Every structure is written in structure tokens, then in C-alpha cells.
């Protein structure tokens, strides 16, 4: 695999530090079945009432892994382990807890705090469920306990498709296209697999031209943009044509009716959600409603950029001069992410400076883990915000677009690094250059205390392993190696090394 245009071929210390943190978090045992309890480090706190559920931490932790895998495509084992852990948790009862427990209308809807007024049409205040209350069981759908098979609950199955697509693109492993159990709660146990979910969503979307709903009864451009991205991954990797339902919905409904991008002027307000039962499109200022832009960017980049620009202009951030006021952790992270995706250098510079000054980037010297504190003074780093900020940290020009529009190429059969003693050792570089038939590898120690220890790793997928040479780039000397089946084992010390593997 030769390097894609605009792609960086290495990871910095922050990215590797966050990878160490997420690896520990994902591999710490816990139980997401009904009788169990997710570990306290999984975020079920951020941005109530819509996103304060554990599964959004799983989802938001996925994106940076996909972006990192395109930086080091010849080293995938750690990414695959993390993604498997995230996806398995998403099959548990706790991932669907809102849909499984919020039955009927919210009994507290007459007592909502005034903060929720932005989220509810004024004429329905006091007699309408707030966004985030799923209302499973209300008519005309009735009780539907399957979180994927239900007519609603798009925000569960749509973002899950993104996770499954990123797993396949990162690993090439078909394990999640074999049937697996979901929820696992007695009679409420449901069997699905990647393609079945994509087929089901495609069929549902064909029947609902306004868009599938999340909570009963709300249709969200934000969640539909995410679901469209999940279908786009399935098409890219499995050769289906499911994404056409998104394209039709975008052309016929979303672009003009929901997001008001049909004018030369940028929109000042957009539809947060549409309720087809009461026939209300709830409008909010565009700075609060530009959230679909991050998911639209790989699908409809022109529309996504106009939506983003409208929101940034409303916040006074589009063409920053000097210090800026941050719009909150999640919004700041997605803004930085898109600034890097589209090479908006002034915005990137201003946001980076403010984020580093205000959001407490922190490196734990003993573990090599990197996280952001966000001035929250909490025991565990806030998961959803950290996952999104990690993606922004790793993003580069066009990197998010490439994930959904350019396949993984031949990386799964190209020379690949395995058996790295992670997290003690990490790779900041692992790239196979097809034209030169050369594999570049860079090792990084967890911290100074481990430097000098012995370590080994393997380079696999080598035809005729005895015909390959491994060189330490710094010294120009041959590295110490031994032959294994279809590969070589490299024996070295833990430190910052550069190796070149060439025929």
C-alpha cells in the first residue's frame, strides 16, 4: 500500500498515549448484560438528556481508532482488540437501556426544567416528551423490544453500523458478519449480524422518505447522517447499494427542508428534529443544529461545509483573529476535527491553542496514557469528550473522507507487524510501500523506565522470509532476527527505533 495523498504516515505521542488509555479502558473486565454493570469509566453523563448513555462512549471512542489505523495500516492488532471490545459491549443490555426501560410517555414531562425549553416546541411544552426519552410502546408502533428490529431507535442501529463498518475496514475480520446475540435478556434476546442490520435499515428507510426515527416520534438529521455513513461503509466494503436511500433523502428532504441549504445565503436556523405525528419541525439556531456536519462530511462534503460554516459564523469563530471562546467540549472537538479535515488553518490554530490552554491535556508519565480533563475534576476522563477530541487530534486533511470512500486496499495481505508488547511498546509508524517493497516501522517506549529492556515483534506475510533484510535505520546495521513461518521475528531493545524491512 502506497501512501494516500495527504495522509500522514506516523502517530504522535498524544495519539499513542490516548491509544494506551483506551486499550486499558476497553480491556478492563466489566459486564454490560442486565444483571451486570458497566465500569465507572464508561461515560453515561455527557450532554443530557439525549447522549447521557453508555453506548455513546463506545461510539465516540471508535472514530479515532479508524483514523489511527490509516496512519499505521501495517499494524492493526491493538486496534482490532479495542474495536472488538467496544462492539461486544454494544451488544449488551446496558447499551440499549434507554430503549428497553423508557416505556410509554415520560411521566415527568410536565415537570421538565426550563433548560429543556430549547428542545421542545413552545406550544407543546408540558405535554411532550423531551428528546432522549425513547417512548417505546407508544402508538402507532406499540412495544418493540428489539433495539435493531424496532421501527424507531435509529440512533442505536445507525451508529452501530458505523462501528461495524470501521471494524471491518480496520481489521478485515468477518467475525461480526456471523450471527451474534443482542441484549441477551431471556426472551429479549435477538440475533443480528452486520449485513442483516444494513439490509434492515435500508428497507426501513425506503419505507420512510422523511427519514427513520430515533425516539418515538422524532426524526433527526443528525442520526440519519450517521446512519447514512454506516450504510456507506457497508457499500464500500461489501459491494451493496444501500447508500442510495441516504442520497435520495438528502436530495429530496434533508438538504433543503431540514437544513435550508437551498439558498445562496447560509441558514440561520435548521431543523433539530421533525415529528411526523404532530407534524412539527423543531427549529434551532444553526450553531446548535450544525451537529450533522461531522457525519455529512464524508457523504456530502459541500453541504457539510456550508452547514459548518453557518454554525461557526454564528458563533463568531469562522475567521478567528486572536484568542477564541470555546463552544464546549464536544462542539470544540468536532470543530477542530473538521478544521483539520478541510485544512482551515486559522481555525485549527485558534482552536488548538484554546483547547490546550483550557481543556487540560495530560500525560501520565507512569503509564504513558494521554487524556483531557476538560476542567471537570472527575475520577475518570470523560469518555465521550475524550473520544471525540482524540479523533480531532489525529485528523488530517481528507482523512475522515478517505475512511468512507477509499477501501483498505491490500493491507491485509501485505507485510504486517504482529506481537508488539503493547502498551509497553507502541508503533508510531508501520507502513508498507508497495512501489519500493519496503516496510517502515517505528517503535516508541511507554516511558523512560522501560527503555533498554529486551523485546520482540514479528513481521508476517513475507513470501520467502529468508530473502528479507531488516535494518536499524539509525545505525545502518542489520537487526537481530530469526525466521518464523511466513515471517521474521525482530529482537531489539525498547526505545525509539526505526526499522526498514526490504527484500
What residue spans do the PLM features occupy?
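Hydrophobic core segments within long, regular secondary-structure runs in both alpha-
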Residues: 8, 12-23, 62, 76-94, ...
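Extended hydrophobic/aromatic-rich secondary-structure runs
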Residues: 44-86, 210-239
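Extended ligand-binding groove/face enriched in aromatic
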Residues: 73-219, 224-225, 265
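Short alpha-helical linear motifs
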Residues: 103-108, 271-274, 375-376
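Solvent-exposed beta-strand/loop surfaces of large extracellular or lumenal domains
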Residues: 471-489
Amino acid at each position: 500500500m502506497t501512501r494516500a495523498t495527504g495522509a500522514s504516515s506516523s502517530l504522535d505521542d498524544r495519539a499513542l498515549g490516548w491509544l494506551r488509555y483506551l486499550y486499558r479502558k476497553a480491556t478492563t473486565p466489566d459486564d454490560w448484560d442486565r444483571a451486570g454493570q458497566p465500569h465507572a469509566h464508561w461515560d453515561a453523563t455527557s450532554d443530557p438528556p439525549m447522549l447521557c448513555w453508555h453506548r455513546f462512549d463506545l461510539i465516540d471512542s471508535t472514530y479515532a481508532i479508524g483514523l489511527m489505523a490509516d496512519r499505521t495500516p501495517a499494524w492493526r492488532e491493538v486496534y482490532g482488540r479495542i474495536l472488538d471490545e467496544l462492539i461486544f459491549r454494544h451488544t449488551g443490555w446496558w447499551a440499549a437501556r434507554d430503549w428497553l426501560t423508557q416505556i410509554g410517555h415520560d411521566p415527568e414531562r410536565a415537570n421538565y426544567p426550563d433548560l429543556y425549553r430549547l428542545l421542545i416546541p413552545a406550544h407543546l411544552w408540558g405535554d411532550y416528551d423531551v428528546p432522549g426519552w425513547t417512548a417505546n410502546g407508544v402508538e402507532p408502533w406499540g412495544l418493540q423490544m428489539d433495539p435493531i428490529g424496532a421501527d424507531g431507535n435509529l440512533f442505536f442501529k445507525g451508529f452501530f453500523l458505523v462501528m461495524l463498518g470501521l471494524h471491518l475496514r480496520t481489521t478485515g475480520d468477518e467475525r461480526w458478519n456471523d450471527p451474534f446475540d443482542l441484549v441477551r435478556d431471556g426472551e429479549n434476546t435477538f440475533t443480528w449480524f452486520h449485513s442483516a442490520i444494513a439490509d434492515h435499515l435500508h428497507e426501513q428507510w425506503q419505507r420512510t422518505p422523511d427519514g427513520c426515527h430515533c425516539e418515538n416520534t422524532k426524526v433527526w438529521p443528525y442520526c440519519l447522517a450517521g446512519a447514512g455513513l454506516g450504510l456507506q461503509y457497508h457499500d464500500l466494503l461489501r459491494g451493496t447499494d444501500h447508500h442510495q436511500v441516504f442520497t435520495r433523502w438528502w436530495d429530496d428532504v434533508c438538504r433543503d427542508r431540514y437544513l435550508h441549504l437551498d439558498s445562496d445565503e447560509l441558514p440561520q436556523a435548521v431543523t433539530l428534529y421533525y415529528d411526523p405525528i404532530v407534524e412539527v419541525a423543531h427549529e434551532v439556531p444553526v450553531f446548535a443544529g450544525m451537529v450533522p456536519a461531522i457525519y455529512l462530511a464524508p457523504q456530502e462534503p459541500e453541504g457539510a461545509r456550508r452547514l459548518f460554516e453557518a454554525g461557526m459564523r454564528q458563533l463568531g469563530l469562522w475567521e478567528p483573529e486572536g484568542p477564541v471562546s470555546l463552544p464546549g467540549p464536544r462542539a470544540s472537538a468536532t470543530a477542530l476535527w473538521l478544521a483539520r479535515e478541510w485544512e482551515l488553518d486559522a481555525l485549527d490554530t485558534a482552536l488548538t491553542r484554546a483547547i490546550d490552554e483550557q481543556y487540560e491535556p495530560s500525560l501520565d508519565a507512569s503509564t504513558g496514557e494521554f487524556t483531557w480533563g476538560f476542567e471537570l475534576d472527575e475520577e475518570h476522563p470523560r469518555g465521550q469528550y475524550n473520544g471525540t477530541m482524540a479523533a480531532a487530534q489525529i485528523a488530517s486533511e481528507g482523512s475522515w473522507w478517505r475512511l468512507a470512500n477509499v477501501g483498505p486496499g491490500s493491507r491485509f495481505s501485505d507485510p504486517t507487524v504482529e506481537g508488539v508488547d503493547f502498551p509497553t511498546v507502541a508503533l508510531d509508524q508501520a507502513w508498507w510501500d508497495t512501489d519500493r517493497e519496503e516496510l517502515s516501522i517505528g517503535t516508541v517506549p511507554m516511558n523512560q523506565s522501560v527503555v533498554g529492556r529486551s523485546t520482540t515483534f514479528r513481521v508476517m506475510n513475507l513470501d520467502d522470509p529468508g530473502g528479507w533484510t531488516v535494518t536499524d535505520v539509525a545505525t545502518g546495521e542489520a537487526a537481530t532476527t530469526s525466521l518464523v513461518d511466513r515471517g521474521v521475528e525482530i529482537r531489539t531493545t525498547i526505545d525509539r527505533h526505526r526499522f526498514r524491512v526490504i527484500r
